[in-house]
Amino acid sequence: LGVPHSYLWFSTTPPALMYEELRKAYDTTADRIWLANCGDLKGAEAQVSFFLDMAYDIDQFNENNVHTYPARWLAKIFGEQYYDTLKDITCSHINLAFSRKPEYMGWGYWNNYWGGGEKRTDTEFSFINYNEAGRRLAEYRRIGKKAEEMLATVDKKAKPALYQLLYYPVKGAELMNRMNMTGQLYRQYVRQKRAAADDLKREATTCHDSLEIITDGYNSLLDGKWKYMMSLRQNYDGSSS
């Protein structure tokens, strides 16, 4: 959880991984007392609930249903009519983060951190080989749009909860990926002396500014009820907020 990169921004631990480890613990007689070091509860509500539900009755879960837990948990809050949408968004969000957490998109040489600053490098997602980066960004844009659409449709009283439980983590992850991988493509275009590099620079800057805006939005919800709970600083340079 420390240098060179923490992962305290979003809770993206896959339910399947949690189930695998806790099922193993339960089956090897660690079935009386479980302790969880979950850090800040804010942002990890679904995972903490999953942990407690498994502690109460682990046999209700199996490898075929654990991946739907986040969607089922959210559907209980916002309505079963949203279950299919929530399942689509949450499963994709967790799968994308499993290949690379949003907090780790800066890449860089970790050992340079000790010199006071980490040198940013390109990601290992390629815009050329199988268009890995392009497909990743397209999927993030898709689920980010679905989260926006759901935020626009839920009841006004439910909007603050949906903003912090679904919209902010999904949109934040989208923008973080877009910012870093657009920056990567920008550097490639600069090396190739392509005029379109300026457009990519503007897009990356817009993503950065949008991250600031939605984070301020989170911290100002309900007259600042969750103020200071979210910070971008740890995700850029590896330090904690």
Task: Annotate each predicted stretch with a short phrase.
Residues 1-241:
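Substrate-binding groove of N-acetylhexosamine-processing glycoside hydrolases
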